[in-house]
Amino acid sequence: EPQTAVSAVETSALAPKTNDTDARLRTLLYVEDNPANLMLVEDLIGRRADIQLLIARDGSRGIEIARASQPDAILMDINLPGINGIEALGILAADPVTAHIPVVALSANAMPRDIEKGLHAGFFRYLTKPIKVNEFMDTLDLALNLATSTSARVGAPKP
């Protein structure tokens, strides 16, 4: 019998952590070139009715989509064709249109120096592959909640 990517024990992590007053649809941009990783994240996010997933297959396209769509959070691979994830993060952080968006690294580069380099570059969090479902979903919730509270402050009328 084939094993599924997500065990039954882990599926509780996929339930949205929202209440009735916070039921708005959130947008996550995933920048990834590997089809297997795309499929896994699409499957995980597909179980969350509160998250809409946008996909870019390289860093340049990710930057374009981020500027045009203003996602609530971005999930980014490091090893991308063309502009890598760290370079893309730098471009997003330098642009006033996208600087506020939390960017989470999701990378196979799992050595401590890789993680330190990513966090130093400005990633909100640095997750490693293979994906640990509970950690992945908790981190997405943190990033999406940060985005919601930040946009609420930015959009709030001044007293």
Residue spans of the language-model regions?
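C-terminal catalytic ATP-binding subdomain
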Residues: E1-K17
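Alpha4 helix (beta4-alpha4-beta5 surface) of REC/receiver domains from two-component response regulators
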Residues: E42, I86-E87, A110-R125, D138
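Short amphipathic alpha-helix used as the core "switch/output" element in two-component signaling
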Residues: E64, I86-A99
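Active-site beta3 strand of CheY-like receiver
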Residues: S69-L75, L80
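The feature encodes the CheY-like receiver
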Residues: P81-N84, A99, M111
